[in-house]
Swiss-Prot record:
GO terms for biological process: translation. Keywords: Ribonucleoprotein, Ribosomal protein. This is Large ribosomal subunit protein bL34. Coiled coil: none annotated. One of its GO terms (molecular function) is structural constituent of ribosome. NCBIfam families: rpmH_bact (TIGR01030). It comes from the Bacteria. GO terms for cellular component: ribonucleoprotein complex; ribosome.
Length: 44
């Protein structure tokens, strides 16, 4: 049985990256929440 986490930088950026977050209304809400919390890293 293979492991569930198969790392890929491209997939990570496309799914969870800054541009992906900015492209949807809910993604922008996530970014705003993380900014309000004071996160150093907003997304992948």
């Amino acid at each position: 049985m293979k492991r569930t986490f198969q790392p890929s930088r491209i997939v990570r950026k496309r799914r969870h990256g800054f541009r992906a977050r900015m492209s949807t209304r809910w993604g922008r809400k996530i970014l705003n929440r993380r900014r309000a919390k004071g996160r150093c890293l907003l997304c992948a």
